[in-house]
Structure formats: C-alpha cells, structure tokens
C-alpha cells in the first residue's frame, strides 16, 4: 500500500491539471504560432513558466486504484499487476483466466 500522502499528492495534481488545462493549451498555442510577434510569444512563455509545476499533465503518475502502487500499473484497468492477479484469482475480473499449458 502506498503512502496516503503520495496518493493525495497525485490526486491534487490531477485536479490542478484539469483546472489549468484550458489556460495551458491557450498559452502553448500562442507560443507555437509563428505568425504572432516575438514579444507576445515571449510573454506567453513567461506566463506559462509562472504557472504551478503540478498543473502540467506530465507530473501525474499512473497509480493503482486499489493499492496506490505507482509501478507496473495497467492503463486500461488502472490496476497494478498485483491487484489484477489478486482479483483474477478470486474471479472478480471478467474474462481473466489463469494461464496453463
């Protein structure tokens, strides 16, 4: 089980990213637009750099919904390999069958 603080920190980052996404996208569009004057693009770059670091989507860590584990998490299920194995052995994951050959 991951520390509660790590899980909460990641949830805070998700909320911040969701709230700041439109503003970040607008600033990035201004920066990428070469037809805009250099001063305006530079001002947008400064505004973007003043925004909180945690409002960037790259700061979000994929974590297991059950355990909070950060490594070996399947994106499709949002579960770690350990949680999938545990739930699968109990028959709680539809379509998951233990392999044997």
UniProtKB/Swiss-Prot annotation:
Protein's GO biological process: translation
InterPro entries with a match to the protein in the record: Ribosomal_uS14 (IPR001209), Ribosomal_uS14_bac/plastid (IPR023036)
GO molecular function, one term: rRNA binding
Compositionally skewed regions (Basic residues) per UniProt: 11-24
Record's keyword terms, sorted: Ribonucleoprotein, Ribosomal protein, RNA-binding, rRNA-binding
One Gene Ontology CC term in the entry: small ribosomal subunit
Region of interest (Disordered), ranges: 1-24
Disulfide-bonded cysteines: none
Biased composition range(s): Basic and acidic residues: 1-10
Entries under Pfam families matching the protein: Ribosomal_S14 (PF00253)
Stated role: Binds 16S rRNA, required for the assembly of 30S particles and may also be responsible for determining the conformation of the 16S rRNA at the A site.
Family that this chain belongs to: Belongs to the universal ribosomal protein uS14 family.
Matching HAMAP family: Ribosomal_uS14_1 (MF_00537)
Quaternary assembly: Part of the 30S ribosomal subunit. Contacts proteins S3 and S10.
Name of protein: Small ribosomal subunit protein uS14
Source organism (scientific name): Rhodopseudomonas palustris (strain BisB18)
């Amino acid at each position: 089980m991951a520390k509660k603080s790590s899980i909460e920190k990641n949830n805070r980052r998700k909320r911040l990213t969701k709230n700041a996404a439109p503003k970040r996208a607008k600033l990035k569009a201004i920066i990428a637009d070469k037809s805009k004057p250099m001063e305006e693009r530079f001002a947008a770059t400064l505004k973007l750099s003043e925004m909180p670091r945690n409002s960037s989507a790259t700061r979000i860590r994929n974590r297991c919904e059950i355990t909070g584990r950060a490594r070996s998490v399947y994106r499709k299920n949002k579960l770690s390999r350990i949680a999938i194995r545990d739930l699968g052995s109990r028959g709680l994951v539809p379509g998951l069958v233990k392999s044997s050959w």
